[in-house]
Amino acid sequence: GTEVQGMLVSAEYSYDDLLRISATAWKIGSYDANSPATITQSYTYSNYEYEGEGNEICDTPLIHSVTTSKPDGSETLYYTYDERGNITYIRRGVSTVVCRYTYDSLGQLTREDNSVLGKTYVWTYDKAGNILSRKTYAYTIGTLGAVQNTVTYGYDTGNWGDLLISFNGQSIAYDGIGNPGTWNGSALTWQGR
């Protein structure tokens, strides 16, 4: 198990015949092993067909639904995809839309309408596909209102065009082997190399 905010958390996984996760059981509790709370998630899959590079038809299983069962009840979320396999809707039950996602012609996420968080997020990208900004608005599925928050991303314009050098106006410095060394006044350390 792992300790999260003073609580012991452990997970058990079940798999189907295709070795996909079919269920997860999370046991959450204090160090009293006799009374942990259990949250389970069960997954169902549906096949998504698309045309591969050689014009062959490829079949990819995508998550159709996730049912979460807790001591106080259960909830099922259903996933809908576009022709590229991008999630377009997450629904609670059959009809209540929880999240709606919009993509550009390159398959980059450009908008998320999230009714649970009460927010709509809009992303912009540069020509290389790097995120330039994420703007936050009050939740809407229609015309956007006033911007509530903007997060910006800055990149190296020299040799390595997709190297993130700033996040939300704060510089990111890298060490000699490419690991971030400082950000927002904090020193970052790396182990294992």
Locate the predicted segments by residue.
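Acidic/glycine-rich beta-solenoid
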Residues: G1-R193
